[in-house]
From Swiss-Prot:
InterPro entries: ExoRNase_PH_dom1, ExoRNase_PH_dom2, ExoRNase_PH_dom2_sf, KH_dom, KH_dom_type_1, KH_dom_type_1_sf, NA-bd_OB-fold, PNPase
PANTHER family per record: POLYRIBONUCLEOTIDE NUCLEOTIDYLTRANSFERASE, POLYRIBONUCLEOTIDE NUCLEOTIDYLTRANSFERASE 1, MITOCHONDRIAL
Protein name, per record: Polyribonucleotide nucleotidyltransferase
Species per Swiss-Prot/TrEMBL record: Nitrosomonas eutropha (strain DSM 101675 / C91 / Nm57)
Domain KH, first and last residues per copy: 553-612
A Gene Ontology biological process term: mRNA catabolic process
Amino acid sequence: MKPIKKSITYGHHTLTIETGEIAKQAHGAVMVSMDDTVVLVTVVGDKKTKPGQDFFPLTVDYQEKFYSAGRIPGSFFKREGRPSEKEILTSRLIDRPIRPLFPDGFYNEVQVIAMVLSSDAEIDADIPATIGASAALILSGIPFDGPIGAARVGYIDNEYVLNPTTTQLNKSQLNLVVAGTQKAVLMVESEANELSEDVMLGAVTYGHDQMQQVINMINELADETGVTAWDWQPAEKDHSLIEKITQLAEADLRDAFRLKQKSVRTEAISEIWQRVFTELKAGTEEGPSEQTIKEIGFALEAKIVRNSILDGESRIDGRGTRTVRPITIRHGVLPRTHGSALFTRGETQALVVTTLGTARDEQKIDALQGDYSERFMLHYNMPPFATGETGRVGSPKRREIGHGRLAKRALLAVLPPVEEFGYAMRVVSEVTESNGSSSMASVCGGCLALMDAGAPLKAHVAGIAMGLIKEGNRFAVLTDILGDEDHLGDMDFKVAGTEEGITALQMDIKIQGITKEIMQVALLQAKEGRLHILDIMKQSLPIARDSVSVHAPRIIKFKINPEKIRDVIGKGGAVIRALTEETGTTIDISDDGSVTIASISNEGGEQAKRRIENITADVEVGKIYEGTVLKLLDFGAIVSILPGKDGLLHISQIANERVESVADHLKEGQIIRVKVLEADDKGRLRLSMKAASTEAAATPENGEK
């Protein structure tokens, strides 16, 4: 195949897709460039299904190569290792809009790999990578109802910006990624600075309109390439078996879905299917496979739940479509933590803990474009017991990393600036029960735990998950969805924000045909639910604590002359090491002279501050100091009046009367008051006890130690 290349202007960038030159043994391969950011995306599919396979094994791996930015990895081995959080999140971003477009019953393994080969600091590779995945899938011939397009939308000076640069995003009130087909939006991921529902919906619509040129370009590329489609057909439906299973299970399933408690309902449904499987197998050696029964069973469960809701009946747990589950809140639940909250909504519960730290505790990130640190971290954990199951416990899975990032996005807009609250903040959400919307429970609990820790947030933030059931022209938007409603529904729509507006939005749609009107209904219904939750949160904890926990570090910030930094650090770090050990503090000094002292006790912090001020203080001629006699000489004594500031007390300046022997009046280690008479060009000091005795003793502010 000869190389084929297509280019368009996309926003203020040139978007190019090439195929036919690199990775020709992959089933589909494209090089996508957006200005100087270049991504190679490949697709390979297995033409045979593994025996007993009952799910679609799609894998998406996004990889950032350090050479793409002209860097060598900072690890010991000097090569790329386990995927970073950014790589995992981008892999999920690509996966979410393409997964719904594979046909039902397609269980062949498919792997998408996106490798960043060249990285422009101003252009994130996630949009080119998503576009590349769409193009490579179309070229592969694998059954896929695409192509899709993707766009990033910013909001600057009340105008939408298509594919803003990194610099533009720094002043944008919105960072939204949208992906979809020619007809429908499939995925939205965003963080915002308390924007209205209308602005957010407008951004989604704007991005979807703009991406149509990308979809057209991919279609043109496929036409020129001459794609050979796979010879795959879905399995024929066994209508007699479907009818038989429906007769055996439908009535009992309807009764089971009226059970409000998740564990009881799950057990009842499991028993129904075990009975059905046994009856279908009775008297036959072959009979239908368990996989076939599961597929028919899922469709039957979906039909029962969906039709019940569309017919105006109560939801699974007896609620109406707009009702939020009962909420209970406790804060300050853990005595030794810096802040904690227990947020329970129905059968979903999150125990959220905040820990405050210093600049040294900030997360150091080795990214493509250089190292940087983040003062706010949010980690989400969901152990298997949260759903009444057994399972692996260990490093976080992709889902946990994605949910943590969503909750973090929701809270970023209300965090206090570092000048106002100088702590590093780590929030950990331990999901102890899960029946839908655990990430949004983490948002609510995270907000309360931060306020319990004394973080002065700009406003309360609450999150809520919305669902959708759509059949033809009939649809129902569901507030605060359950796990089963998420599983059997058509949309998972998570919205977080304050009373003023939205701070984070995530939408995943499983079907095509979601209109702007439906999204508008969902957003307005989500606002109604969000405000309800915010009212309950405010009643529980109206404002942040006045002070941080007694177990949290105390932070003192001040500035010194940058030229004096070396005096505080000392030779080989000796001075600052002694300061931290003797005062029990942690001391950080920036190049601009900013000093941050963290200590468990106020006394230790103030002592460290006082000693640093003494070290960096300039000696003033005519001022009286308390000094320590360091050494006796025949003609006087060497006296230290400030750390590193020694002067000569001549024998004639010790007393008004004649002094025959210095030792008769002074001894080493003695504390005396002296006045600075003179400081020469070389910094040598001439001191006097006689002059000091005629004036008032120095106060602590005047240098007393």
